Amino acid sequence: MLHGRLRDILRLLMAAEAPVTSSFFAAQLNVTTRTVRNDIKELQGVLSGHGAFVQSVRGSGYKLRIDDEQVFRTLLQDEFQQKKGLPVLPEERMAYLMKRLLLADHYLKLDELAEELFISKSTLQTDLKEVKKRLLPYRIVMETRPNYGFKLRGDEVQMRYCMAEYIVDERETEIDVLNEKADILPKEEIEIIRSAILKKMKNDRIPLSNMGLNNLIIHIAIACKRIRTENYVSLFPKDMDHILHQKEYQAAEAIVKELESKLSVTFPKDETAYITMHLLGTKRMTQSQCGEDTFSIEEETDQLTLAMIKAVDRELKLGILHDKELKIGLALHMKPAISRNRYGMNLRNPMLAAIKEHYPLAFEAGIIAGIVIKEQTGIEIHENEIGYLALHFGAAIERKKTESPPKRCIIVCASGAGSAQLLREKLRSHFGKRLDILGTAEYYSLDQMSYESIDFVISTIPIKKELPVPVLKVNTILGGTDFTKIESILSDEKEKANRYLKKELVFFQEDLRSKEEVIQFLGQKVVECGFADEEIIDSIFEREDMSPTCFGNLVAIPHPLVPQTKTTFWAVCTLKKPIDWESQRVQFVCLLCVEKENKADLQSMYKLLGSILDDPAAMNQLIKCRSYQELSDVFDQKMLS
């Protein structure tokens, strides 16, 4: 019932807390506002009778209203769980074309492919230019033959890596849904591969993570498919010699023996070595998953891990230097990671986009760790690998939060002792040990109190006096918004944007057409204002080369690879029209500059930025801003909401 673009509009409406304009939808979807209005009219027809409707709010935009949650939920289940048909959005077509070309064992004709997708030849040719860009890192080319059409050519190992990345939907992590989406092998054969791997892993007591197992199944399934069409890998003698001396080679031989008998596929020696490469590069379980006695860490890996943690803690001030679980988790991750790099393997990371969007601080920690790895080993870490490193650092950040001492407060309540007692018990019940309530106080006594041991005041009445600590006004009978206000204090989320914004470095509706133009523009403005040297621009591009800083929701947050400035601040720019920033559309750019030798905890700043990344309505407001004060107010309102 809903084609791809309608699904995306519905997703954006569901995520927005405030009305969203047609221009915001147009920028996100790369269509005109007229197309958006037509789409919303079509969406309205679908939602009619399904418990929801799109409300047009005069002067503000569109908002989703839900009348019957149960009926609406049924619609969502029907729409989002059914198998997708033909692609509609450009990004959907990219994914379709990549799969189509990679799986084709014959030449494809332009006319036939355009007809298959219900698009014009010119649109298809534009799409194929983007396909060629995506094939470039794998050194795969599109070979054209007159009267026949075109097909892909490249090194077999790289072809298989590309297939693993693009044939299987990167969001799918469970192997039982991989087969129906990817069409690599029949389901029964996938099960045979899974059983052969698990049998050997169990016999040899090799601990394997669920994601590691799934990646291994994918690569072996692709190998089977390619061998059947007589496409074989050929490894360098140096690599073969190294692989043959690994204990994993024997495990690969056992798996191959079972597959040959059950799948009627013959694996040459190089193909067995290819499976060994993936066994060497497979993610293993962590210490907590497989027990103390099932792993050992080499001295070299131990030292590298410690250097990574020290660098991250020095740059970001996370207080994670003595986190034993982090050290063990990273060390266990590094050995297969180094093997993956040795053989040019690119581990799929279905969580990468979510990690970058929701855990920007942890991802930055992964970037810093990647720099250390390159400095000490010469290994260039891929973006997917950085995402996995970020997970380890993100877990350490969360563990650190639980170690924080409780916040201390007093209660001011004008309704009497009974109300104060109810309020106190409700707070204790909700926040537990995170909140230490020192007692209650009368309004008139606030001037005589010492606030040295008090972090904030909770009051059921307005307090007009200036107090040296924050005051939170709540209802006597606590509600959801009251808890949210208190949570923001307990989580140290109360951060003001004007602490980082500088009027001379905020620009609106700039007519810039590319990522390079935007970075050059903002970097040059920072230099002209005397906040950094010219080197900052090169450093920003270096960081961008490691991993694009676009996060979806029309946002990009570029920054130097290493801190370059005397203070921590933002340079902000909105654009007249969205631009392509790698794989995302971007219209709001925040150049993040962190102080050299920074000693401050930046977690609250990253939370402030993260709150904007997650909110389409807030981003819509920021893009419409025309003054510094408007921009600052949107940020502050977001933190209060």
From Swiss-Prot:
Domain PTS EIIA type-2: 499-638
Matching Gene3D superfamilies: 3.40.50.2300, Mannitol-specific EII, Chain A (3.40.930.10), PRD domain (1.10.1790.10), Winged helix-like DNA-binding domain superfamily/Winged helix DNA-binding domain (1.10.10.10)
Residues in PRD domain copies: 184-289, 296-403
Pfam families attached to this UniProt entry: HTH_11 (PF08279), Mga (PF05043), PRD (PF00874), PTS_EIIA_2 (PF00359)
InterPro entries given in the database record: BglG_antiterminators, HTH_11, Mga_HTH, PRD, PRD_sf, PTrfase/Anion_transptr, PTS_EIIA_type-2_dom, PTS_EIIB-like_sf
PTM sites of type Phosphohistidine: H219, H278, H333, H392, H559
Domain (PTS EIIB type-2): residue spans on this chain: 407-498
Effect on the protein upon substituting H333A: Loss of activity
Modified residues (Phosphocysteine): C413
CDD domains noted in UniProt: PTS_IIA_fru, PTS_IIB_bgl_like
Gene Ontology molecular function, alphabetical: kinase activity; protein-N(PI)-phosphohistidine-sugar phosphotransferase activity; RNA binding
GO biological process: phosphoenolpyruvate-dependent sugar phosphotransferase system; regulation of DNA-templated transcription
EC number of this enzyme: 2.7.1.-
Keywords, ordered alphabetically: Activator, Kinase, Phosphoprotein, Repeat, RNA-binding, Transcription, Transcription regulation, Transferase
Activity regulation summary: The regulatory activity of LicR is modulated by phosphorylation and dephosphorylation of the various LicR domains. It becomes activated via phosphoryl group transfer from PEP, EI and HPr on the two conserved histidine residues in the PRD 2 domain, whereas phosphorylation of the EIIA-like domain on His-559 by the PTS EIIB component LicB inactivates LicR.
Enzyme class: transferase
Keyword Transcription regulation: yes
Role noted for this protein: Positive regulator of the licABCH operon.
UniProt family annotation: Belongs to the transcriptional antiterminator BglG family.
Name under which the protein is recorded: Probable licABCH operon regulator
